[in-house]
């Protein structure tokens, strides 16, 4: 091996060690934290792991030829007796049973959707062999028919179209409905919403309710303006005479008008000027 090839192998080893350390740190954080880590913390850990995996993939892609022709042989000073399990793991030529089952399941899934599984066993792609160039433009080449195609490209395109159609259907139709299709099939009168008011599905009723709310807001605004005008013009006459609907205007009326836009005080609001003043009784001093 040349020094440059040894450097690439050492770089890949460091990346795997860093990935293992980050996975162990995340596992410890989730297991020992009470409460669990925040969403932002978990997302940051996931981003770090994705960056590590992407770095390993880039190194493996660039040095695919080197890693395919390398043969591992333990040195004479390796402690094979005490570290036999590590040596067996490093020299293993076949996949582990659980990994082998995952691979077979993935191949069966690929065959089920019409993908040739033999195309998926071609090893790691070299840079430039995909249907996108080094500038990151994907599927923009004019002579894309001559380039080798990703066997999953059609499946990803179908999933993207299906997702976009489902999302458009949900945003334009389903999100405006108050009941699901299952609830409508079973009868909306049997739906337990936890609300006391009657919910109807008619769009005309929704428009009528919006118009009624707008009318009520206009009436309240007009009433508030009329009350404010009556306060400005009749405070000197009606209030001074002690007559009128509200009688004398008290500070409580002003505060309630400012807060609610109405001079009609509720019955439970006390008026300070009408509170009965109790004179404290004086205790007579005993004779000396």
Curated annotation (Swiss-Prot):
Record has Transcription regulation as a keyword: yes
Keyword annotations of the record: Activator, Coiled coil, Nucleus, Transcription, Transcription regulation
One GO-annotated biological process of the protein: regulation of transcription by RNA polymerase II
InterPro entries: Mediatior_Med8_fun/met
Chief location category: nucleus
GO cellular component, as recorded: core mediator complex; mediator complex
Single GO MF descriptor: transcription coregulator activity
Coiled coil segments of this chain: 4-58, 180-228
Chain intervals with Gly residues compositional bias: 227-245
Biased composition (Acidic residues): 131-148, 200-221
Annotated spans, Disordered: 122-150, 191-245, 266-288
Pfam family of the protein (one): Med8
Role of this protein: Component of the Mediator complex, a coactivator involved in the regulated transcription of nearly all RNA polymerase II-dependent genes. Mediator functions as a bridge to convey information from gene-specific regulatory proteins to the basal RNA polymerase II transcription machinery. Mediator is recruited to promoters by direct interactions with regulatory proteins and serves as a scaffold for the assembly of a functional preinitiation complex with RNA polymerase II and the general transcription factors.
Subunit structure: Component of the Mediator complex.
Entry's family note: Belongs to the Mediator complex subunit 8 family.
Name under which the protein is recorded: Mediator of RNA polymerase II transcription subunit 8
Protein source organism: Chaetomium globosum (strain ATCC 6205 / CBS 148.51 / DSM 1962 / NBRC 6347 / NRRL 1970)
Top-level taxonomy: Eukaryota, Fungi, Dikarya, Ascomycota, Pezizomycotina
Gene name of the record: MED8
């Amino acid at each position: 091996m040349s020094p440059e090839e040894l450097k690439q192998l050492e770089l890949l080893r460091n990346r795997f060690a860093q990935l293992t350390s980050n996975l162990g740190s995340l596992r410890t954080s989730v297991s020992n934290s009470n409460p669990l880590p925040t969403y932002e913390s978990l997302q940051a850990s996931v981003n770090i792991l994705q960056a590590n995996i992407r770095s390993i993939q880039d190194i493996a892609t660039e040095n695919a030829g080197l890693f395919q022709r390398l043969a591992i042989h333990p040195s004479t000073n390796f402690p094979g007796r005490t570290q036999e399990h590590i040596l067996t793991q490093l020299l293993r030529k076949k996949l582990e049973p659980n990994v082998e089952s995952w691979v077979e399941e993935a191949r069966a899934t690929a065959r089920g959707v019409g993908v040739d599984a033999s195309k998926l066993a071609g090893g790691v792609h070299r840079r430039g062999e995909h249907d996108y160039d080094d500038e990151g433009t994907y599927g923009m080449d004019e002579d894309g028919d001559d380039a080798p195609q990703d066997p999953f490209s059609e499946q990803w395109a179908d999933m993207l179209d299906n997702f976009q159609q489902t999302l458009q259907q949900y945003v334009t139709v389903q999100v405006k409905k108050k009941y699901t299709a299952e609830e409508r099939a079973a009868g909306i009168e049997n739906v337990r919403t936890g609300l006391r008011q009657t919910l109807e599905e008619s769009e005309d009723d929704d428009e009528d309710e919006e118009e009624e709310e707008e009318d009520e807001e206009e009436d309240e605004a007009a009433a508030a303006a009329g009350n404010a005008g009556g306060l400005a013009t009749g405070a000197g006459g009606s209030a001074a005479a002690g007559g009128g609907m509200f009688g004398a205007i008290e500070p409580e009326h002003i505060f309630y008008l400012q807060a609610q836009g109405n001079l009609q005080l509720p019955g439970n609001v006390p008026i300070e000027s009408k509170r009965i003043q109790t004179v404290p009784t004086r205790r007579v001093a005993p004779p000396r």
